[in-house]
């Protein structure tokens, strides 16, 4: 069982590096049903993890876009606010003082 786990770990590392993009998918020998069941479960878990990773990446991209949009709105609102008692005096000369 240990060599199988080592082999699967090696394949996972190669897959993560993109080395197996053109290679054929791994198909274990069907001699031992316990090994094939474990391998099938492992492959199912890997597929599910790939789906979850893709969903997380899409969610992060979406949230990043939303945050940028909200920050833009806040900046626009900040420029349109009337000056209050604690607001800095406007820089009429543009010299920063």
UniProtKB/Swiss-Prot annotation:
Key words, A-Z: Secreted, Signal
One Pfam family, short name: PLAC9
Signal peptide location: 1-22
Species whose genome carries this gene: Homo sapiens (Human)
InterPro entries: PLAC9
Compartments, record wording: Secreted
The organism's place on the tree of life at top rank: Eukaryota
A GO term from the CC aspect: extracellular region
Protein family per UniProt: Belongs to the PLAC9 family.
Primary localization: secreted
Protein name: Placenta-specific protein 9
